Amino acid sequence: HYPMPRDIELLVLDAERGLGNGRLLPAGPLREPASRLGSVDVVLERNSNDPDCGFSYQPSCARHLASGRQVAWSECVDEWREQSMVAITGLGQPMQFFEMLRGQGLTMETESLGDHEAVTPAHLDRRGEQVVLVTAKDAVKLPECTDPRVWVVAIEVALPSSLLTRLTAL
């Protein structure tokens, strides 16, 4: 990605984890050397209370994977509250997804796959009649899925106003 032209360069960190052990994958959590902090335009931090760099995200709606129908998140929570559910993801930090869902009042089983591992029909088959929640990243790996239990959680990110002002000015 270095040769690609850009107007602004963002670096995203988790404020709680920071740079971890400071080492690159697979020995540590970093995808690039810590020295990159000095060459980016903006640093964004998840779990930060700093209004200039902190960001948060919440579910905005859910898309029924088989039909494409979108439903407001509040309606989904009301409907699913009494149902048996499982959240399955191949995210690198799956607990963030699971905690976000629990923070919305949902109770569910969870299944963490390896980072970038695809959710497969076999994963779904083990789940009986449970409602299955996945991320958009997971859903793109299920292009032919017609399983009526699978819902994709759409996430809305709240960026710092200073960044939004800067992006608008570009």
For the regions a language model picked out, list residue spans one by one.
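A short, acidic, amphipathic alpha-helical segment used as a generic capping/interface helix at domain edges
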Residues: 116-131, 137-139
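Residue-level signal for inorganic ion chemistry
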Residues: 40, 90, 132
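Short, polar loop motifs at secondary-structure junctions
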Residues: 43-50, 94, 135-140
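Short, flexible loop segments at boundaries between secondary-structure elements
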Residues: 114-118, 149-170
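Hydrophobic residues at beta-strand termini and immediately following loops
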Residues: 13, 55, 111, 153
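Short, conserved loop/helix-junction motifs that constitute active-site signature segments
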Residues: 4-5, 34-39, 77-81, 127, ...
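Phosphate/Mg2+-binding loops and adjacent switch elements
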Residues: 1-54, 61
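Redox- and metal-dependent alpha/beta enzyme cores, enriched for Fe-S-associated oxidoreductases
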Residues: 63, 67-69, 75-116, 138
